């Protein structure tokens, strides 16, 4: 356990990793953090400031001023000519922070200036460090070395100690990290860990401690995945942790403001970790190969059409979801942050479109719930104002569906179990055909999509195919109801309402299915009352639907008329 944690600490970067972890650890073991890392402001050498016992002075209460560095400290880190090097930063603390920035209520406390690093001080500069400490130590100012070993001990004795984490959870945690190269096994053990942590979680500090255990365990798992060059389990676990963290925050109505604020910060950390690992997986790892013909289909390393199809839809869905997160965050941001998020959104859309163009399997959804990934791609295109660029994708899907339904060849089914999918189709008999197509959300989604992009001729052909070949199919949509908010994030159970569509026979001149869908949205408003939607976190609901394989509610189906944004350029086209 110590080795796992020590390697994790050693790998942490200074910004957005070590400087995020340290305040969490200090808060957990009883320190009062009075200064957090800032961006764009003068720090005067101090990354984190906290009041608490000095472990090197028999627990005497002191003001700790932390200077944070990643990895090992060598000669170039000590005084290599940059203002942010260790020695200039220590001088800045002495001459600026201490005389000018310490709050009055802490001014009489002894001061511990702590050089905090993920690794250790190398021998080549050890003498410089000792000389500096001896020269500048006074009765009220002393210097401390907080190396990776101390941080690992702090994690193990605090957040991940045996009493707090428990034997079963520690075993689940260790297995999830050890099996990171076996994604399904690693994910299963991490889910066991997270289930144990949030079960009957308290509203007080003990509950917040459990959340900190969750996020630190996740950080370590992600670090192990990066080290092993396998991001599958870390990505899935980040999604799961984000959903669970939101559920805990959403249930914290009885918590004090201090605890609620701490839990909101933890949620932000998990979201940042998801965005980071998503960028590594989608933009950095998949992106460079997305525009190469069959490259990612070949990367699946399977001759099975099913394996390739499932893997490519998974990749497209992840790209679309990551893009939607950056879209919603970007719209709320300003200046450079806004530009950065919207640029990443455009990258994600371009990657998803390239996947479609270069991997024809994406025009052949084998599962009915692949409407989730298709719907998210369309929603992302709408956000960018580029729906017209991906309409060809929808038309190609429907054209192929017409053929597959009539010839009863590799048609999409509502089955989700891999073994059933691997056997599908068992035969072409009427009995099996009806059994495997008895319900569908994909079909009404595609009908509405064709109507909204005004592909009227293709829509007419598709409706005729469905009427003649699938008269027994129940076409339906799923909408949340009161109480869905209690179950969807953690359990992912379908606590909603299934509505058969069309609600009445659509004859020539009657109301369109798209109009009926608009009426359903108008009449079933529970989605708009869901906690995440009310707080502007629509991508969180999309993530829950995709992660737990719940149908995409019609409230979140794309609208062509709402997609045009004059300030946005059209995206890349998805052609056949």
Model-derived regions, located:
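Mixed-charge (Asp/Glu-Lys/Arg
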Residues: 1-576
